[in-house]
């Protein structure tokens, strides 16, 4: 079946609800265009899932939200955070990433102790007081639901942790910088079901303090944890709505076919 990629439904939010917004976002890898006119608004203190087949543009889109594609892709359009376009050449990228953090698909702890994994960036940003560092380590590990498992082994190598623990450590490391927004690129795809459930539980708790945007291939996961869902296809955002509506009453036929498994 052929679909009209201009047939779209994109939910619009109230101005006060927005934590982040993209306007006419187009992304190119050389001459190949990977994203077409991406216009999305993300609500504060909610989880938004980005779904779609491999190569649909969702990870490319996610990485653009804190300029992780810089030097690899040509990004055109606006990404507005607190009313400021973070694509502006005047923006200090490293400073901006304190506010818009990233957790990658595979756990990537530093080959340092658990404690040093969290304090390394803090020290680089001028926090030297030992009591303050210890406080942030404890708070971050508690928010990532890891403190009780590692509190007596903070000097242990992070590489000795299980995969699920390593991923929660990476989440703790990211939130130690006190970001407003946390981007997660398939954070549970490399984990077993028990570790995945723990990550999902952690994310649901984190949205009380952070805005979360997550790429997932797992539609059941998207339906379980997200408030909003955006469906990507061939570099286009086809539908963006509240998750319940996406999964029970999609407005676009292409979305319906993808969700129901009748795609293609």
Swiss-Prot record:
GO cellular component: plasma membrane
GO biological process: phosphate ion transmembrane transport
InterPro entries referenced in this protein's UniProt entry, alphabetically: AAA+_ATPase, ABC_transporter-like_ATP-bd, ABC_transporter-like_CS, P-loop_NTPase, PstB-like
GO molecular function: ATP binding; ATP hydrolysis activity; ATPase-coupled phosphate ion transmembrane transporter activity
The protein's Enzyme Commission number: 7.3.2.1
Enzymatic class: translocase
SMART domains: AAA
Residues the record lists as binding ATP: 52-59
Pfam family, one: ABC_tran
ABC transporter domain span: 20-259
Family: Belongs to the ABC transporter superfamily. Phosphate importer (TC 3.A.1.7) family.
Cited NCBIfam families: 3a0107s01c2
Quaternary structure and partners: The complex is composed of two ATP-binding proteins (PstB), two transmembrane proteins (PstC and PstA) and a solute-binding protein (PstS).
Name of this protein: Phosphate import ATP-binding protein PstB 1
Organism: Ligilactobacillus salivarius (strain UCC118) (Lactobacillus salivarius)
Higher taxonomy: Bacteria, Bacillati, Bacillota, Bacilli, Lactobacillales
Recorded name of the encoding gene: pstB1
